[in-house]
Structure formats: C-alpha cells, structure tokens
C-alpha cells in the first residue's frame, strides 16, 4: 500500500498511558517519535529504545509522521495537532491506537474505577509465569519488568481500559474485567451515575460471543449491571455467589494469605505479596483468568507469591532515618501510593493498618483535581480523619481552574472542625519534607499519596534524610 503507516508520532509521549503504547510500537518495528514538555525516566527509556524524543511542542516535531496519537489531555490548539490537521495527517486518539494493538492479538482489558493498574499487572504476571508470554500495556511501572509495557510473543495483550473519558468503548477484547464502578470523572458522564453504569454495560457488549466478562460481585454497582451483561460471566470476590471466591483470608507480614475456591477447579492456597483485602480481590481476577486459560496452579501460586508490585501502588521505599539536629534518632517506614479517590485511599489506609499493626500512620496527601475535591469533599474528610497525623497540600489542578471551597485550605478547615486529626497544611509539595520532619517519629509509617507531583517526594525523602 502506498499510504502504509510507518512513522507514528505521540503528543505527550512521557505519560504512562501514551508511553506504553509507544514502547510496544517501537518493538514492533515502527518508527516512533514523540514530544513532551519535560524529559523524565519514561522519555529517556523510549529514547534508548530508538524513539525520537523532542522536549517541547512544535509543528516541526511531526515531520515525516503518518499518524499523530493524542490523549484527551492534549488541547486542540496544540501546535502539533494544528500542524497535523493542516497537513491532513490522521489524528488518532490513544484508545483507538490501543484498540488497533489489541486487534493484533487476543485482548484482555481491565476496567473499573479503582484497581485497574494492579489488576492488570497481576494478570500479566500470572500469564507470564504460565509461559503465555503476554504483551502488556499498564498505567504504572511493573517493578519486576522495570517498564509499563512489553511486547510478548504470546497470543494475548493485557491492558487497562480507561473509563475516565469513556475511551474504553473503543476496545473489543475477548476477556474483560470490571473491578468496581464508583463515582469518579463524572464530568464525562454529565454528572449522571446511571450514564456511567450504562457505559460499563456497553463495554461488556464489546465482547464477542465467545468472550468472557470477569466481574467483582462484591461491588454493589457491578452486581446491579449483571442482568444486562449478555456474554458469559465469571463472578469473583468474597461474596457467597462468587465462582472464584477467597476464604480463610489472613494478613501477615505485609502479605495476604487465602484460599481461592473455584467452581470448576480445585481450591488453591495463595500467598499474595501485597497487603490489603482489596488486593485479594484484584488477585482473584487474575486467578479467574489464569484458570480459564489453563495456567497451572503452581505457576499461579509462584507469580502471586513473587509479585514485586507496581510503581506508586503501595510502593515500599524501606526504612528512612528520622533526622534531628543532623543526627539519626530512629527510623520510619516510607510507602508511596497513587491513591487519589476516597475509596482507594481508605483501602490503602486499611492495608497499611494490616501490614503494620500498632504503628502510628502519618499521611502526606496531595488532592488531585478541584472537581474531585468538590464532588467527594465529605468522603475526603472522613478518610483523612482516620490517620494519626496528616500533612495536606494544595490541590494539584491537572489543568482545572480553582473552585471556591474545594481547595486544600477548605479541606484543612473541615478536618479541624471534625476534630479527629490536626492537619499541617502546606501550599506546595516542595514543603512536604520539612513538614513531615516536624511530625514524624521513630517507628512511624509514612505514606505519601496522590496522583500529582507528590510522586516525586518519596525519592527526595529517601535522599535528603541520609546522614
């Protein structure tokens, strides 16, 4: 074909969603270029793989491209988008490009408001342990692979399905997982929860007649859509009607021990190298898929026991010195987490309590988006009130305009009125290390949490407190 696509350009290539697709395309032999406002470890990795990276957005960056990939975060007046439109170069939404990758293999798409990244990583790890060598595209760095994407030689591609902009409706996988359905990104759905649930129903309708929907029946909203799912279903969770069900669940030494009861297979004893009952649910989804694909029980057990986690999902940085007057006076345990919705945060706090019983829990939290802070304000107050000490920053806007009474200071005031925790408020994440040093004690567990720039803080804490 004269117009065959050889060169694909990514606008915003340094993001986790875009970079994973770019890496797979590089490994498939395509010429890949991309731009972003700043360089980071992701862009450095892609450059080392052979992608051409430009820092800053400019029309000349798309020179020679046959297609330009954009995410919903890219503005329509971006100079590269304008240049592509002027030159009649196809502008391809990220989800459409992911759908094209899925057409090359059998797709396994992981959807849900919470837990997508961890569940996708668990599924990919279990299939890899079973010798299926899957391709994966994950919204976080799989620590064992050192990357958020990999091109495998097997028949399957495992990827996250993003409901935040309804782009998951572009995908046509053969296996789907829905972990849960919660009120988030409601602007996309006109603040109508029924529309959000309908989108998930439509997502299941993308399955072929031989496809399977793997659904967490512990979630009441997932349970409500069951009658509208027309394809075969595997139910998982703690619920009595789950076909893949966890029993005898115990937390020990930061790990979860349980037995997975399976409707069409023998029970299997699991040691999961992650804390928290929510991660037991995530592991059950992986067990359900692995069982369906005839992965051996020993391989399932090994993959879950050896799972090293995902970057910024309860990522442990180890012991960090408590420094006083230039001298170490004990140490605290540092954990970093991407949680930014009250439901996710509550699960992480519960996991920390289970993993570190009896220890004081200190949270440094950066709220993400003014709209989410407004929509979930009371739930934020409730979950933030459950920690022992709190450092709270201003909201990371993610491009949104401020909303009155939905900022960090408003949250701090509401927390003081609630009276269960006295927040230390700081305007920027740059102030977090000093604020933490004033409240942290020997033996504490410190969690840095949020989806914004606070992700850079734990590395600083680990470095700056060396003595």
UniProtKB/Swiss-Prot annotation:
SUPFAM superfamilies, alphabetized: MurCD N-terminal domain, MurD-like peptide ligases, catalytic domain, MurD-like peptide ligases, peptide-binding domain
UniProt source species: Paraburkholderia phytofirmans (strain DSM 17436 / LMG 22146 / PsJN) (Burkholderia phytofirmans)
Residue sites binding ATP per the record: 112-118
Function (record text): Cell wall formation.
EC top class, as a word: ligase
Pathway involvement of the protein, from the record: Cell wall biogenesis; peptidoglycan biosynthesis
Keywords: ATP-binding, Cell cycle, Cell division, Cell shape, Cell wall biogenesis/degradation, Cytoplasm, Ligase, Nucleotide-binding, Peptidoglycan synthesis
GO molecular function, one term: UDP-N-acetylmuramate-L-alanine ligase activity
Protein name: UDP-N-acetylmuramate--L-alanine ligase
Subcellular location: Cytoplasm
Family listed: Belongs to the MurCDEF family.
EC numbers for this chain: 6.3.2.8
């Amino acid at each position: 074909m004269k117009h065959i696509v050889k060169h694909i350009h990514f606008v915003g290539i340094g993001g986790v969603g875009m970079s994973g697709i770019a890496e797979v395309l590089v490994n498939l032999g395509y010429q890949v270029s991309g731009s972003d406002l700043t360089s980071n470890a992701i862009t450095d990795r892609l450059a080392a793989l052979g992608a051409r990276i430009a820092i800053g957005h400019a029309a000349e960056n798309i020179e020679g491209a046959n297609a330009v990939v954009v995410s919903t975060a890219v503005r329509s007046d971006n100079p590269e988008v304008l240049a592509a439109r002027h030159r009649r170069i196809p502008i391809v939404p990220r989800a459409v490009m992911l759908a094209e990758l899925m057409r090359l293999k059998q797709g396994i798409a992981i959807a849900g408001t919470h837990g997508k990244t961890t569940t996708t990583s668990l599924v990919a790890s279990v299939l890899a342990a079973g010798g299926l060598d899957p391709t994966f595209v994950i919204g976080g760095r799989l620590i064992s692979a050192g990357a958020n994407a990999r091109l495998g030689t097997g028949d399957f591609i495992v990827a996250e399905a993003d409901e935040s902009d309804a782009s998951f409706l572009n995908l046509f996988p053969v296996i789907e997982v829905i972990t849960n359905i919660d009120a988030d990104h409601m602007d996309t759905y006109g603040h109508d929860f029924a529309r959000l649930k309908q989108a998930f129903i439509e997502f299941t309708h993308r399955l072929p007649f031989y496809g399977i929907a793997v659904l967490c029946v512990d979630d009441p909203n997932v349970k409500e859509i069951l009658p509208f799912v027309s394809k075969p279903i595997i139910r998982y969770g703690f619920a009595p009607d789950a076909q893949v069900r966890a029993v005898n669940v115990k937390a020990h030494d930061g790990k979860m021990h349980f037995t997975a009861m399976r409707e069409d297979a023998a029970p299997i004893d699991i040691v999961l190298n992650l804390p928290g009952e929510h991660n037991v649910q995530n592991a059950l989804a992986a067990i359900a898929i692995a069982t369906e694909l005839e992965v051996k029980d020993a391989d399932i057990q090994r993959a879950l026991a050896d799972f090293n986690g995902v970057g910024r999902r309860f990522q442990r940085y180890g012991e960090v010195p408590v420094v006083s007057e230039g001298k170490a006076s004990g140490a605290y345990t540092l954990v970093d987490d991407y949680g930014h919705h009250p439901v996710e945060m509550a699960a992480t706090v519960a996991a920390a309590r289970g993993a570190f019983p009896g220890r004081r829990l200190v949270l440094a939290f950066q709220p993400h988006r003014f709209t989410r802070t407004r929509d979930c304000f009371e739930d934020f107050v409730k979950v933030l009130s459950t920690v022992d000490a709190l450092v709270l920053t201003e909201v990371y806007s993610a491009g949104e305009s401020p909303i009155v009474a939905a900022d960090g200071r408003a949250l701090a005031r509401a927390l003081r009125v609630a009276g269960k925790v006295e927040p230390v408020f700081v305007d920027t994440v740059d102030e977090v290390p000093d604020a933490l040093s004033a409240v942290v004690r020997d033996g504490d567990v410190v969690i840095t949490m949020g989806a914004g720039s606070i992700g850079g803080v734990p590395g600083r804490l680990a470095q700056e407190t060396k003595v």
